[in-house]
Each structure stands twice: as structure tokens, then as C-alpha cells.
């Protein structure tokens, strides 16, 4: 994401006159920005030589320009990236423009008996007051392009603020998880929920519950557990949980003889070939008499 953003930021800013652009869409609360990228541009260059690659690029440029309306601005960026700004249109106009451009490109290259197939990804945002800065526009636009690149064929993604917020939240949590693991699991905490025998009113079992603190808030388990499993970071964290729970259990045995401890394990952990050996190794570290 950072590559396109950093390389083209100044170029875009100088070309379109950002101050005038922002004055326009703040007043109208309308308009859109559309960034497009040819996915297989490296393959076009290296498998068909530069001459054909230049032809494809110039063809795309012609198709874009021929599809533009009067008040739409076009900028050719680096690495086969193209940007279109419209100060009056909306999301539907952006989608229709992309469809028009891709249809035009397909028709032109088919007429020329194209030698290689490629697809185009496009990310779009509706310009509104929530985009309060130039950097914000580019950040969200580039986010949309990256999302579009995850689809197949010619693909279009319209920026969704709620989707963006959710993904940024995940990124923030995952970044904190990496930090915590690399700092001796700082921020991870274990709480022990007692299970009581209703007849004797005594604690017979404890269940270990994993919690994660990030700055001044506790992250909901449903937010961070799935991230741990998806990234397989559940393996180092899970080992820490088992070891910490066993250490606590050993100490509590002195106060409550016969106390049991339940520790949940993820399928990712259980599915590891060495999961049983890992448990044995942890027990050996704590107290071999427990074996």
C-alpha cells in the first residue's frame, strides 16, 4: 500500500491542484476518485518484450481518455497506475466509468489480436466531508485499490468506511499481538474462572481464560482469538497459556488439594504433530512429578 501512496503523492498533488480540489468537493459534498492498476504489467513487459508492453499501456491510456467526461481529470502514475478525479459524479458514475473503460480496452485489444491477457483492478471513493485531508483521500483510495486486487478478473471496489474501520482495527490489534509476544507476552493475562460443587460449596475446577490488554482497553476475545488462529500465533501464545496455567495450578494445589484446571486448546494447536510432546515438555519444566 505504501509504495503507490508515497511514490505518487506529490505527483498527484501537483497535477490536480489539491487546494482547488478540496474547495470543490467540500462545497458540493460530491465527486469521486478512481485509481486503476494493471495487475500483470510485469508479465506483459518481460514475456512480450517492451514494445508490446508500450502498446498495451498506450492503448489503455487512449481508452481511459476516450471514456472521460469534461470535468473528469486523468493522471498517469508510475507502474501502470492511473487516477481519475471527478468533482461532480457519485459511486454509480465511478462504477459505470470503470465498466466503460474496461469494455473499451477489451474491444481494442481484441481488434489488435492481443498476445496476452491481463486484468485491471480499480478502487474508488466518493469524495465527501469525511475525507478531511489530502492524505486521508489517498490513504483510503489506495486501501480500496488493494481490496480490489484481491478479487478475480477486472474488479472494482468502492470504499466502505465501516469495512475500513474494521480492517484498521484488526491491523492495530495484530500489531499489538506481535509486540506483546516479542515482549515476553506483556499485555496477555490469564483469569481463572471457578467451578463450584453446589453440594460442598467448594471450588473443584478452574478454567483458564485468556485476555489481552492493549493500551487502556481490554480486547474482546472474539476479536483477538480469531487473529491468533489465522496467523498461527496461537502456537506461541497457546504454549504461554499452558505453562502459565500449570504454574498457577501447581501453586493453588497447596491451598486446594485435588483442584483441577481446564485449559482450552485451539484446533490449530491440537492439529500440530508435536502438540502432545509440547504439553509433556511444559510439565517437565514445571514439575516432573506431575507426569
What are these regions (language model features)?
Residues 4, 20-32, 36-39, 47-51, ...:
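Nucleotide second-messenger and two-component phosphorelay signaling modules
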Residues 4, 17-20, 169-227, 264:
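Active-site core of bacterial EAL-family cyclic-dinucleotide phosphodiesterase domains
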Residues 85-94, 112-137, 162-166, 194-200, ...:
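Catalytic strand-loop-helix junctions within cyclic-nucleotide turnover domains
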Residues 2-32, 39-65, 75-79, 91-99, ...:
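Conserved long alpha-helical elements within nucleotide-processing catalytic cores of c-di-GMP signaling
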Residues 61-68, 93-111, 139-142, 241-250:
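Alpha-helical scaffold within the catalytic cores of cyclic-nucleotide enzymes
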Residues 75-78, 105-121, 149, 217, ...:
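Catalytic core regions of nucleotide second-messenger enzymes
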Residues 74, 100, 121-130, 136-151, ...:
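Cyclic nucleotide signaling catalytic output domains
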Amino acid at each position: 500500500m505504501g509504495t503507490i501512496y508515497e511514490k505518487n503523492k506529490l505527483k498527484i498533488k501537483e497535477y490536480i491542484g489539491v487546494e482547488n480540489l478540496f474547495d470543490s468537493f467540500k462545497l458540493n459534498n460530491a465527486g469521486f476518485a478512481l485509481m486503476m492498476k494493471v495487475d500483470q504489467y510485469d508479465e506483459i513487459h518481460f514475456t512480450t518484450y517492451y514494445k508490446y508492453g508500450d502498446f498495451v499501456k498506450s492503448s489503455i491510456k487512449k481508452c481511459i481518455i476516450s471514456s472521460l467526461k469534461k470535468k473528469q481529470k486523468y493522471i498517469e502514475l508510475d507502474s501502470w497506475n492511473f487516477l481519475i478525479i471527478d468533482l461532480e459524479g457519485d459511486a454509480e458514475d465511478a462504477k459505470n466509468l470503470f465498466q466503460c473503460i474496461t469494455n473499451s480496452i477489451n474491444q481494442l485489444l481484441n481488434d489488435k489480436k492481443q498476445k496476452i491477457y491481463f486484468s485491471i483492478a480499480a478502487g474508488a471513493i466518493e469524495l465527501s466531508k469525511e475525507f478531511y485531508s489530502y492524505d486521508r483521500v489517498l490513504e483510503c483510495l489506495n486501501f480500496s485499490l488493494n481490496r480490489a486486487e484481491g478479487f478475480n478478473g477486472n474488479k472494482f471496489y468502492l470504499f466502505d468506511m465501516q469495512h475500513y474501520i474494521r480492517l484498521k482495527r484488526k491491523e492495530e490489534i495484530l500489531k499489538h499481538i506481535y509486540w506483546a509476544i516479542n515482549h515476553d507476552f506483556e499485555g496477555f493475562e490469564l483469569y481463572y474462572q471457578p467451578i463450584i460443587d453446589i453440594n460442598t460449596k467448594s471450588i473443584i475446577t478452574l478454567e483458564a481464560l485468556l485476555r489481552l490488554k492493549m493500551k487502556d482497553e481490554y480486547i474482546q476475545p472474539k476479536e483477538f482469538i480469531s487473529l491468533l488462529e489465522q496467523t498461527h500465533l496461537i502456537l506461541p501464545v497457546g504454549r504461554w497459556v499452558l505453562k502459565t496455567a500449570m504454574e498457577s495450578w501447581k501453586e493453588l494445589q497447596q491451598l486446594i488439594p485435588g483442584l483441577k484446571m481446564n485449559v482450552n486448546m485451539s484446533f490449530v494447536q491440537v492439529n500440530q504433530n508435536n502438540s502432545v510432546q509440547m504439553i509433556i515438555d511444559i510439565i517437565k519444566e514445571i514439575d516432573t512429578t506431575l507426569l
